[in-house]
Amino acid sequence: MFDVTVSEGVKLNKSTFRNALAREGSFVTNWREQPWTGVFGATLCPFQADESLDVPGLRQYITELTHADGMQGLVCNGHTGEIMSLSPAERQQVTRIVAETVADCRRPIKVISGVSAEGSLEAINHARSARDAGADAILLMPPHHWLRFGRLSSTAVGFVKDVADAADIDVIVHQYPAWTKAGYTLDEMKEMVRHERVVMIKMGTRDMARWLYDYERLKAVAPDVSIVTCHDEFLLPTLLEGADGALIGFAGFAPTLLVRMVHAALDGDLAAARQCQKTVAPLARLIYNFGEPGCGAHQRMKVARWLLGRFPSPHFRRPVRPLTQDAINQIRGALAELAITL
């Protein structure tokens, strides 16, 4: 049960929380007391040389991430975790391993599992599998055939509602970039956040001109639903414009640094956040090459952590090919120049 204490010691469950906040005309200001705010690190997925899952390596990596004080949640089976190369059974296996490892750390860290499916029934089944494996929520991606063909507004809203109605697990809506045919409109998201099981929007719109406008209007409709940035390349600007946290692959790469930076921004400590940004910026250029997360980012993350002795292997699953030796040498040189300690 979702419970929160607000002014005058009144305790509300989630079913009445939105109405109470609307009557007060304000939001709960202490973000640290909220269940879906802060830093949610998207995790990498290690493979053996034969392309099988590296289970011991995954446990070791997740254990390290749990040691980042202040990490609010871990997100497996995202794009950073190469969900598209994992079978449904492997996605559930990865979720179970992450949930078991988090449970062993004896600190409350939420487990979120990505769901990518082409239809409502398949997505519901995958969401239930994640729930059964120990996930606290799912990250619901839009069906990828929308990227090519688009969709009707009723289809977009209906897809989220179908899964939220039937899966019996909290839902994080993954907003894709505005330039794709799979991104949601503001009106569509306003419908989605009204659903009881929708707890967060991972706001990947990448339209900075609309960021604050959309944030304020979504919070007006559903103040208890977190709006978090996934803009690794615009992390500090989006946090300062208006965000309740960050759900990013970069936090699965440099967890302690990213927790420190996001927390400073959420606390309003601009000087500390900008100091962190001085270290984050060159790392982001190394991983993202001045752009948004793309097809090669998780490769560079894996190789960089492996070169630093912080990841079990640099292996990928086909059709992804290994980085060239020149690319590996470039990463090695950049890491040496930056003298980074993750």
Report residues per predicted region:
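A general structural signal for well-ordered alpha-helical segments in protein cores
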Residues: 58, 95, 123, 160, ...
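Short secondary-structure boundary segments
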Residues: 43, 78, 142-143, 205, ...
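Active-site beta->alpha loop and helix N-cap motifs at the rims of alpha/beta catalytic domains
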Residues: 24-183, 321
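Short helix-capping segments at alpha-helix termini
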Residues: 101-109, 134, 167-169, 194-197, ...
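C-terminal alpha-helical cap/extension of soluble enzyme domains
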Residues: 21, 27-29, 38-44, 64, ...
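Catalytic alpha/beta core domains of metabolic enzymes, predominantly
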Residues: 177-284
